[in-house]
Amino acid sequence: MKGLMCAKYDDLVGNLQQAHGEARKWWAINSHNELVELFVNNENGAWTIIITRSNDPISCALIGGDNSGANYDIDSTVEMKQ
């Protein structure tokens, strides 16, 4: 995952929570057995998607944005089967 913002899972999630006010709103396991998560700040609409490999303690922020305008008052999970 070269060129991405990567850190230990707890450090990356802690930064999203503390510095950006984002909380996990959705997660899924993809076909490569990687954890994909969406973090959202409900006040300003900022969001970040991170990915974590099952065999690696490092997580990477794939993409993020501001003012999405969507309602993230959800708590859903999806597990994709191989």
Q: Predicted segment positions?
A:
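Polybasic/polar functional segments that serve as interface/processing modules
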Residues: 1-82
